[in-house]
Amino acid sequence: MKKKSISLLYLISIVFLPWCISFTFKKSLESWFINWWNTSQSEIFLNDIKEKSILKKFIELKELFFLDDMLKECPKTYLQNLRTGIYKETIQLIKTHNEDRMNTILHFSTNIICFFILSGYSILGNQELILINSLVREFIYNLSDTIKAFSILLLTDLCIGFHSTRGWELIMGFVSKDFGFAQNDQIISGLVSTFPVILDTIFKYWIFRYLNRISPSLVVIYHSMND
């Protein structure tokens, strides 16, 4: 009982501790880092503006300047307000882009922190991980073949079923955003069309090589439920 409690606490710490540390790190440095970046990196931004979305917004501002030339007959106060508005929008655009870049850096940093924490768990907590593995194996072994077959069928339908495409798109979009990469629909579509197929092949091979050997009755129940 004591070993089970220790394993449960260890598993909870694996799940929540990396997230809590990375979240605290991000929130404690986010505001200071963004303010520093906005005050010291604006000139670098103006010399290195290549992103398509930012260019589109600057083109819109340029069109406003053309509109300014067309409105020369308007009162000077209106034209001055127009120039001031364009200037403010440009500054806001710089700050928004800088915040996006800083969030990308912070996301990448927190992911690196999580990786090192989990690596430390795997190296320093080898005995606890072995105990957790044995408890999970014991729990699965005590389940009936019907429940095992139902769980396998549910998991495969979620991962490689007909309606799993949208779920994979959301997962890959979230992962790319979390790592700070711009969402590319073509890359995501390519991964969605190939990754479930690879998983399906691996799963069928696993059934053929592993389940047929250790539990033929489970394979029979699975195929009957799948049909």
UniProtKB/Swiss-Prot annotation:
Stored InterPro entries: CemA (IPR004282)
GO BP, one annotated term: potassium ion transport
Keywords noted in UniProt: Antiport, Chloroplast, Hydrogen ion transport, Ion transport, Membrane, Plastid, Plastid inner membrane, Potassium, Potassium transport, Transmembrane, Transmembrane helix, Transport
A Gene Ontology molecular function term of the record: antiporter activity
Places the protein is found: Plastid, Chloroplast inner membrane
Transmembrane parts of this sequence: 5-25, 112-132, 143-163, 187-207
Chemical reaction(s) catalysed: K(+)(in) + H(+)(out) = K(+)(out) + H(+)(in)
S-S bonds: none
The family this protein is said to belong to: Belongs to the CemA family.
Role played: Contributes to K(+)/H(+) antiport activity by supporting proton efflux to control proton extrusion and homeostasis in chloroplasts in a light-dependent manner to modulate photosynthesis. Prevents excessive induction of non-photochemical quenching (NPQ) under continuous-light conditions. Indirectly promotes efficient inorganic carbon uptake into chloroplasts.
Entry protein name: Potassium/proton antiporter CemA
Species assigned in the record: Phaseolus vulgaris (Kidney bean)
Gene this chain is encoded by: cemA
